[in-house]
């Protein structure tokens, strides 16, 4: 079975994961920046981007090691491409494209909002009609069944 690598750097968490067969999350490594931004009362985009630079490679390495997967078994690299903080997204997308090129596999850009929706269906992918709302984004989507 082949694996997909996922990278997320859209705001203040740096994350990497390996997924098998589309739904089975084999490993997930996350570094949060909550303490880093606490004194400012919110996320500072420049600080977030620089923190991603420091933490992304260790998160990718940890996800691969925890999964016990050889890089040759990874068949695609997916990464959040938006919406999000531009500098933070650039860190993730640059790393993901570099890995895809190095490993000779496709790069897959992922919409951050749709990824939240898909995550809700990892255990029960039946009805995919959903609305996602938060204080700064709203989106209504209907995702076709993968079955």
Language model region names:
Residues 1-2, 129, 133-147:
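Single conserved hydrophobic/aromatic residue that forms the stacking wall/gate
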